[in-house]
């Protein structure tokens, strides 16, 4: 259990057409991105998204162990998602639990769908995601950070991975749920896409949505992802500019 | 992937280019589903043995008494565990649940939990005491599509489940209070992409040829979705998978409830 | 603890010369056997014995890991005995406990004593036993199922393994204890033999038996094993007939 | 088995054909048994250090307070653990108890439990509180036949055990209520088959040559038996092993109690 | 050690022979220390992000309610855990805390515990209920000397920590009773020996060249010491390290408290 | 927690200038040493020190696993410190805990500083320490026993390792704390030295000591270690004499 939910089931999540934190239905929380933030990784990124704080870093391509599981046709990309004990209000015991195993898998799957792994046969590429503060939507924040770190590492990618969740609260479809909305809402739909082609790389849902609500929510998540994509591109571009400027100094 | 697996995959893919499946099923056709409810009824309050083609899964329900979650002090608790037993495939190893087993367990769990299939509010006993429904999925023969078999088995076993008698702080084994209150029948349908086609209920050969997959669990609404595995869908493919999943779930629901 | 035992210590287990389920002292419970029941194993068997339901299957001979533990003179046969969580009234936590480790070992030892392992040096043969419903005597049921599965797999065997338990209830020696008799009885004596030569392959005992009671109980268990042997032979024979008939179709 | 082990095995087996043992013992003769009760008496309520030939085992008893089993609410609890410490043999690895340690622990446990050696009914304290006797067997030097050494050590340590004082819900360390109530002295005797002979108390060389083994634990009746290892016995051999076990147990019991 | 590491080590050592460090610091000079208290303040009662040169460590404090130790029924409890996250170095592996992480955690813990930095007597709530302070050190980028970074981070985070409100047996999340009572500021200083010199705050290159190391944690007295690693100190070197540690701790304490 | 400490905080540890067990401030507890006490090790030792009873034994030099962690320049020496469940008043759960992992490491470090490991490249030397009864100061007792066992094994050593703790009780600096002094004292300072050169091999401290108290305590621990060294030398010498005498018989 990530956090204890309070027993107030009839909490109103929409008041006067606005969400609890004053956002419109299609409005994202505040987002800050940065790459190249760690010294010991070949690529790294830091993303603040609402109250979420997530760090991602890449080691590799490097020797894959155990030997007999190596793939002679491509690198094996493994993402490890980890929450700091103090990232949630009720301390999380250190170490992987079932939830983090699942999130690690779906992020690994999404990144592996766009990275050109064929370039590095027999190796392993390890992407580490550290959730330093969690406030709903960590899997989308994590995949965005991981994708930035991977791009920053120089591993060639067919496309970036952008992600955003939508959901249903008080019967309305909204984008990018924060903690209270996630706890008391009726549905969560995280989506990750390769923004240039529009392919779906990650799609999960739990709650309840009619066929029509799904379409609306899906489109809202994709629209959110596209906004994220613009920020990701700018972040990577800025880092290159800084890099060039830094070199000239 | 060894050479035999590669050849199978190749054969499945080339057939699929002509719109044909290796066992001649239609793209949206399930293999035969056989459900034996009450398989372990001498010991387990609920159980169901599922044959999905030659995939075999046994699901058992245990009912225990424990503490509620602090945030829902008057609601029962449910938990889902999947064991990919090594007997089921030479490819499974012994040991603790791994990535694949955990993912299947969590997708099955979400379908049941989010649809409210178990009326957890009726599982309150007294202060700090509620019923815990343990859903244990035991995979015995992996002929493909164990996720759907597990999901069909879980809700079938729940429908079979009796609530034990509880008196003076003690569970009376072998005596029953009535049935476990079940409100609806969520059914997961897994759609796999092979070439430019989507098919349901992949057999083992089709799983070798699978590019990626999407599971959609429905009641009268969508309750859970999970894209799984490397590979991509277009949003049109996702829409198609949702349509198919509603349709097939309806058919399967009749078998489960029937 | 496999199951909670009720506190009724003075429960009568023999009434009017009959056991609780109406059996005579030397009478086995109902037994049903089948082989070739799984698709992914090289050999498999299913046995219902009273309220016990047990499935066994064999993978291998196949590469043995880790390499440095391979035996260049023969295959290493490993049996893994596992109880489903719901096979007993009080849910058993999944995973091996000390009891199942011991039972796995004694079954491995018994099967290894009759299988011609020298034929497959450097390999491993893995026998998996799944207890789907448990009602006393599972180790005998398991060894009978495992032996059928191994025979069904084509691994050559010097003999089958037949097994049956006897015990003492209300001071009387009886064969094949069911749950209540096992819980409130005074002794349990599971025996496995190679039925043609009469060799003892497995022998365990706990409780209390005088020297004479032991002899009586041992003989009863061997007699039970011999009945089991006849059923095992018939089961294997029937499967071959079916196989031939199936082939002719 | 390396070449040295093979030669030892061969030598033991060929001697045995003439009815002789490598250390000139009679077939039913144990090595010297030395028992030092109270070895760890400054900390442990009961203990015994056993030398069985050059096999060394230290057994300690800890007494804790805990809940009874629900089906025996007025009986104490016992539990047996065996640690094959890596110091005892270059062949033991570090780590959690393995197959062999578990089997030894369970055979030792059954002998004590089934004979009723510990009068568990006298270990009741108050509602939901009983004494738990932890029997911890620490194997320090494996010169062969650690099972019998462990079993002899366990009952010796139990006979040495004092029951701590318990007042107002607290165990008073270092003060004692009396002795742990012990009713009898179960003794395991392990018979190994080498060629056509049965011998007791195998040393390490004899264990290499061992075909299979049978442990019989007796008081005035048989309380536990365990055939262990690949290989077979005839029923006559089993009978012989039982006779020998009764006889040797009687001799050893005098050493333990004496 | 690969060839690159060997060359670095060699370079560091030869510079040191001239009394120089690879980054031109004085022997007793720390790299720049940046402390951001309250980094995770939206969720954690206390936290601090430490940059020690390019070493990065995040420490979070969680406050839970639990049982006191039986021997100190009216005192709160503290516990320290260090996670060497694999993101921090290609040399760290995933998995449970290992030798190195445990040693660091225990040295950090001893400094805080033995100095009485947390006034545990003020963490009593009611019978059998006390506050537990969980100190979780998350190492994110290992540029050398993570022990000192962890120790500085731990006490900084404790100084940042608010005590949650506790009413009617429930912790009120997001409401605070006041600050966690902290009595002093223990600071660990790690002295490493390279050739015949002692230096503080080794960077990664200097750690390759390190012969052995001594950590001294001080307040106005010495509270903890730990020699770590293969290699030896003379007693004069130990004395020098203690002097240096008192001096540097004083400077660092001002940064922490400032 | 090794043992439950009683709540008597104001217990007097020094009465009339004497310690609770009658010792002077600079007096060691009774000590007994022996080597060559086990048959299956290449070297072994047994040390009784006050109420502590500790056994140490050495296996190796032998193949080191896993292969990729071998050191081609020297042997890897690993000490494993283990407390028997019954060695303390409140039963310790079997298996390594964080405390024993740390003690294992500091003993490994100290022994590795004097053993000539370069003689055995690519191998492992395993030193096992079994605490059979514990009564404060077990890490010093263990290192003394381990050093004797290593010397007894024939692995060449530049020097022995001698060790002794000092500490502060009732404000006074004393040597070699026993249990009550350790529990209610103000400080513990275990020291291990190579006695011929006087090098410090192990140094730990917890509690509180002023600069001057430290010097006094350190010197007292070193003096204790030197006494231990004399006993260690005598023990090794006696064992050689016995060995020669034994050979002549």
Model regions and ranges:
Chain B
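Polyanion-binding surfaces on beta-sheet-dominated domains and ring/shell assemblies
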Residues: 1-258
């Amino acid at each position: 259990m990530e956090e204890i939910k309070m027993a107030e089931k009839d909490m109103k999540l929409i008041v006067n057409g606005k969400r609890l934190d004053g956002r419109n239905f299609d409005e994202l929380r505040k987002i800050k991105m940065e790459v190249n933030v760690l010294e010991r990784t070949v690529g790294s990124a830091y993303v603040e998204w609402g109250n979420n704080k997530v760090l991602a870093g890449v080691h590799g391509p490097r020797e894959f162990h155990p030997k007999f599981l190596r793939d002679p046709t491509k690198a094996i990309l493994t993402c490890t998602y980890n929450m700091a004990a103090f990232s949630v209000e009720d301390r999380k015991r250190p170490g992987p639990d079932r939830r983090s195993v699942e999130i690690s898998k779906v992020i690994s799957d999404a990144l592996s769908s766009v990275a050109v792994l064929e370039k590095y046969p027999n190796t392993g590429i390890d992407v580490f995601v550290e959730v330093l503060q969690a406030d709903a939507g960590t899997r989308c924040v994590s995949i965005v950070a991981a994708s930035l770190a991977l791009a920053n590492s120089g591993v060639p990618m067919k496309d970036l991975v952008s992600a955003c969740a939508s959901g249903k609260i008080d019967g309305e479809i909204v984008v990018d749920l924060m903690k209270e909305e996630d706890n008391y809402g009726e549905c969560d739909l995280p989506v990750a896409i390769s923004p240039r082609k529009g392919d779906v790389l990650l799609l999960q849902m739990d709650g309840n949505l009619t066929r029509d609500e799904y379409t609306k929510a899906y489109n809202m998540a994709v629209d959110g992802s596209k906004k994220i994509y613009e920020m990701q591109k700018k972040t990577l571009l800025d880092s290159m500019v800084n890099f060039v400027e830094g070199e000239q100094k | 992937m060894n050479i035999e697996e590669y050849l199978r995959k190749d054969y499945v893919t080339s057939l699929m280019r002509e719109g044909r499946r290796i066992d001649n099923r239609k793209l949206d056709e399930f293999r035969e589903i056989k459900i034996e409810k009450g398989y372990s009824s001498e010991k387990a309050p609920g159980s169901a043995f599922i044959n999905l083609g030659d995939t075999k899964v046994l699901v058992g329900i245990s009912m225990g008494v424990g503490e509620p979650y602090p945030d829902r002090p008057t609601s029962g608790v449910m938990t889902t565990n999947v064991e990919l037993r090594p007997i089921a495939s030479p490819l499974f190893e012994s040991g603790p649940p791994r990535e694949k087993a955990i993912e299947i367990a969590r997708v099955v769990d979400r379908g049941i939990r989010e649809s409210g299939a178990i009326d957890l509010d009726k599982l309150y006993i007294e202060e700090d005491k509620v019923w815990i429904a343990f859903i244990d999925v035991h995979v015995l023969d992996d002929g493909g599509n164990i996720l759907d078999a597990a999901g069909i088995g879980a809700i079938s076993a729940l429908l079979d489940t009796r609530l034990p008698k509880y008196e003076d702080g003690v569970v009376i084994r072998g005596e029953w209070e009535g049935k476990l209150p079940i409100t609806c029948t969520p059914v997961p349908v897994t759609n796999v992409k092979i070439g430019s086609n989507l098919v349901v209920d992949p057999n083992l050969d089709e799983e070798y040829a699978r590019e990626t997959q999407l599971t959609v669990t429905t009641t009268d609404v969508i309750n859970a979705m999970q894209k799984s595995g490397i590979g991509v869908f277009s949003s049109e493919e996702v829409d198609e998978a949702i349509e198919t999943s509603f349709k097939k779930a309806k058919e399967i629901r009749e078998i489960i409830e029937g």
